[in-house]
Amino acid sequence: TGVSLEDIESATFERFPQLATRRKQLAGTLSGGEQQMLAMSRALGTNPRILLLDELSMGLAPIIVKDLYQIVHQLSQEGIAVLVVEQFARTVLGVSNKAGIMINGKIVREGEPNELEEQLSAAYLGKKSSNS
C-alpha cells in the first residue's frame, strides 16, 4: 500500500489512544473493547474503502460501545463506507446516514435513521407503525 509501519502505528494510536499504553501487551490479554479497537486498526491499516463490522458492541461496556461508535461515525465522515450488523439497532442509528432493518435474513425496511426509529420501536413492541 506504500504506507510505512510507523505511519500505520501512528494513525492507530491517534485514533485509539488507549492502545498506545498497551503497545507491549499481547493481543489476547487486552480487554474486549481494546481487542475490538485493535481489530479495527488492523483493518484500517489497509486503507479500505469499506469496513464491515459484525456485532461491534457484543459483550462490551456501554461507555466503550459509545466510544467505538464515535469512531465509526468519524470513519464515515472521512469517506469510508461502514457496514454494521448490530443486534442493538438504536446504537447504530445514532451514527448512521442510511440504515436497514433485517428480519430472518431479509431486508424489510431501508431509509434514513430517523425514519426507521419509529418502525424499530413498533417492531420491538409488536405494533404497526404509521410508516408500515
Residue ranges with predicted function:
Residues 86-87:
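H-loop/switch region of ABC-family ATPase nucleotide-binding domains
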